[in-house]
């Protein structure tokens, strides 16, 4: 009687019917008990002549090989069954957790609105923090800018040289413009970024034969792509120069410094405003001196020759 839960494997026909002298059948029974683990019991019943020992030995070797094959097969099947069982458990666990499921357009918009409502105070807090930081940095810059302005006052014609030496501005300035700029004593740029981004350019002049203004202010609204003219101080030309100013403004319709200076809404004037605000004002010293081109037939040395 086999133990309950045991697995029985029968030896193939080639082992059950051997070629012994009497032609009697040999039978092997292998019992693998599930409770005993890997214990196997093999019983062989032989009928025939007792003197044929060599054939019995051959049959024994084949039986051992068969048992090895059976055990290997059982191990492979057990591993496959365990893998399948683990996959099924994972699938059941995944199905047990309720997922969000597909969202309809209406529910997606509701969810988006809820997220946006939560995001608004975060954005407002970030704007306030950025504004406070910007104001803090402006306060730190102001004493340095004031000191720089005071030092520039001691350098005659500083701003005239800076503007005339700038690679882009130099193409927009005539000899008459340079003479007018020679009376310029200071340049200041202020930026306001509270409600709108406003760039204010202030040009300070000493007494000159062209106009009466001591300060000329030009304001521009700034966005990502451009500087847009907002306000400008009207220029009070002296009567002796007013006719010439009119002639210059209408004689040359291309963009130049005089047209920008005298006509705030002149096409392309935002280009000059951007150069003054973003480049010249931030570091004018780099344009105060310019490189002198090497003379023909001379070699350039390591030391740069500068012109003021």
UniProtKB/Swiss-Prot annotation:
It is found in: Cytoplasm; Nucleus. One of its GO terms (cellular component) is nucleus. It holds the Pfam family NAP. GO terms for molecular function: chromatin binding; histone binding. Keywords: Cytoplasm, Developmental protein, Differentiation, Gonadal differentiation, Nucleus, Spermatogenesis. The keyword Cytoplasm applies. Coiled coil: none annotated. Its main location: cytoplasm. PANTHER family: TESTIS-SPECIFIC Y-ENCODED PROTEIN (PTHR11875). May be involved in sperm differentiation and proliferation. This is Testis-specific Y-encoded protein 2. It comes from Homo sapiens (Human). The gene is TSPY2.
């Amino acid at each position: 009687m086999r133990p309950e839960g045991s697995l029985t494997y029968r030896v193939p026909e080639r082992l059950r019917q051997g070629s012994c002298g009497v032609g009697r059948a040999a039978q092997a029974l292998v019992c693998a008990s599930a409770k005993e683990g890997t214990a196997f019991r093999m019983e062989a019943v032989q009928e025939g002549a007792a003197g044929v020992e060599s054939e019995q030995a051959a049959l024994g070797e084949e039986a051992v090989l068969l048992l090895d094959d059976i055990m290997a097969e059982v191990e492979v099947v057990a591993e496959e069954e365990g893998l399948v069982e683990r996959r099924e458990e994972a699938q059941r666990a995944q199905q047990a957790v309720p997922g969000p499921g597909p969202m309809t357009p209406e529910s997606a918009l509701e969810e988006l609105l809820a997220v946006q409502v939560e995001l608004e105070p975060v954005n407002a807090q970030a704007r306030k923090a950025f504004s406070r930081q910007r104001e803090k940095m402006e306060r730190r810059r102001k004493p340095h800018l004031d000191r720089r302005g005071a030092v520039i006052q001691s350098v005659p014609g500083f701003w005239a040289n800076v503007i005339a030496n700038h690679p882009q501005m130099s193409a927009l300035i005539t000899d008459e413009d340079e003479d007018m700029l020679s009376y310029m004593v200071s340049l200041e740029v202020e930026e306001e970024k509270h409600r709108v981004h406003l760039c204010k350019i202030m040009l300070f002049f000493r007494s000159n034969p062209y106009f009466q203004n001591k300060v000329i202010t030009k304001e521009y609204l700034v966005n990502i792509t451009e500087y847009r003219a907002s306000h400008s101080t009207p220029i009070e030309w002296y009567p002796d120069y007013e006719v010439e100013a009119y002639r210059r403004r209408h004689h040359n319709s291309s963009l130049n410094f005089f047209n920008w200076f005298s006509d705030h809404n002149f096409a392309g004037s935002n280009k000059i405003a951007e150069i003054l605000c973003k480049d010249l004002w931030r570091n004018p010293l780099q344009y105060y001196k310019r490189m002198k081109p090497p003379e023909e037939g001379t070699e350039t040395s390591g030391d740069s020759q500068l012109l003021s």
